[in-house]
Amino acid sequence: PETTVETINNGEALKVTFDSGILFATNSSTLSDASRSALRKLAVSLNENPDTDIKIVGYTDNTGKVDCNQTLSEKRAKSVYDYLMVDQGVSGRRMEYEGKGVHDPVASNDTPEGRALNRRVEILILANEKMIQDAQQGTLK
C-alpha cells in the first residue's frame, strides 16, 4: 500500500504512513509530484482540525551507511514538514519532525519487500491540550 491510516495509542492518535517510494526518489529528500498531491489532501484535513499536533518521522531501510541513512531520514521528514508549513499553511507551532534512520523497522530488511516497507514517512496526528480539554468538558466540536 502507498498510504495507510491507522489508530494508535488506544485510539488517541492517528498514524498516516506514506511509502517513501511515492514521496521520494532513491537517496533523495526532494518531494515528488505524487507526494505533493497526497500531502495536499492531508493538509486540508490538518487545517480543518487545528486542535491537533503533528509529528513527522522519517525512516530508511538498512542499505548503506547508518549515518547516511540517519541524515536522509531527517531530511525527508523536514521536507514533509516544510511542504506542509510553507506550501499548505499548516502551522509550524503544531508540528515537529525527526529522522529515525534504520531504527524501528516494520519489516525484515532481509528481503526487497521488507526494505520497501521500512522506507517510509509516518505522520502522527495527536490531540493537543485544547482538544483533550474540550473532550473532557463535552464541548468537542
Language model regions located:
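Periplasmic peptidoglycan-binding/tethering modules of Gram-negative envelope proteins
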Residues: 1-53, 126-141
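A short, charged
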Residues: 41-71
